[in-house]
């Protein structure tokens, strides 16, 4: 009879670490004025934090995403 191993805690830790890495990487792209790539990475980080269950970090990333989008991209609405 095989026993199942509970790896859910490890997955949550992985999601948080991956989210932190993506935020750090996005900051490098931001400094290099690669705003589109920065937004892509922040979007991915937001998803990782959501999966990892750290809603406060996800909200911080979302706020940063919206701030960059508002300040560095022009609205296409006419």
Language-model features, listed with the residues they occupy:
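Start-of-helix signal in alpha-solenoid helical-repeat scaffolds, especially tetratricopeptide repeats
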Residues: 5, 12, 17-20, 38-39, ...
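Alpha-helical linker/edge segments of TPR/alpha-solenoid repeat scaffolds
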Residues: 5, 63-78
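Structural signature of alpha-solenoid helical repeat scaffolds
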Residues: 6, 11-13, 33, 53
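Structural register within alpha-helical repeat arrays
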Residues: 18, 25, 32, 44-45, ...
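Short, charge-rich amphipathic alpha-helical segments embedded
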Residues: 39-70
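Hydrophobic/aromatic side-chain positions at a characteristic register within alpha-helices
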Residues: 11, 23, 30, 37, ...
